[in-house]
Amino acid sequence: MDNSNSRDPHSFGAPPIIASPAKRIEAFTGDPNFMTSLARGLAVIHAFQERKRHLTIAQISHRTEIPRAAVRRCLHTLMKLGYVTTDGRTYSLLPKVLTLGHAYLSSTPMALTAQPILDRLSEQLHEACSVATLEGDEVLYIARSATPLRLISVDLSVGSRLPAYCTSMGRILLAALDDAALQEYFERADLQIKTSRTLHTREKLLPCLEQIRQQGWCVVDQELEVGLRSLAVPVLDASGQVMAAMNVGTHASRITRQELERRFLPLLLKGSQELSSKLFH
């Protein structure tokens, strides 16, 4: 894996936030075709994050700088349409929100090309296989072939997001960043302890990422959740740069780390190379 500084540091990093959602919406004042109510509704949806799944009206208003009355109307509309629910005080998103991005993610060239490859890998390995890209500080699942057995508490599907620092695909993608982009990531990322095994400091993660650069693959062993062991490899673009990651997730009680490397790694590398070849040749 090439970690030269010639890569565009913004290829995988989050774009800088230059204004609050409310300020960005205000910039379109005077445009007769701009729907402020729709823009506010989308801003309310984006206010929810993995670490803040339950928010009050006041919290959403603070995050977006949209007036509370407008936030309340947006939430009421989203509830009526089945995108949001409430316990009387806080609000949270419902799974229907995933449909907003699922159609796009599932129809991208990479997703369409990756799906049959993942299906074949999943059938060969009898484990769930996925492809993801880096979106801000998280990995975004764009294709997945699941198995009936759920591996973690979150039901993963196309559009799901997980923290990059403690997932195998995330570390593949972080290892592909140049030094400047990686520095920016560590300055803003919220590195939480998920299990007793989680590498959650820059000092521990940097040597790990350097090893990934050298060997070209990554195993994460029960750092996101106890029992989850996963292996990931890079998916390269036409110039040989990392554009995505492909992984297989297993339960630690079924598959040893040695078996992941011995039996699963060759098949996963072959799958990622096939995906790159079909996309760019």
Which sequence ranges carry the predicted segments?
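Short, structured helix-loop boundary elements
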Residues: 34-38, 94, 107, 111, ...
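Amphipathic alpha-helical effector-binding/dimerization core
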Residues: 90-188
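N-terminal helix-turn-helix
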Residues: 2-112, 273, 277-281
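Short hydrophobic beta-strand micro-motif common in sensory/regulatory domains
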Residues: 229-233
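Sensor-regulatory modules in signal-transduction proteins
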Residues: 235-238
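Short, solvent-exposed recognition segments
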Residues: 2-24, 151-224
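Juxtadomain coupling helices with adjacent low-complexity linkers
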Residues: 244-281
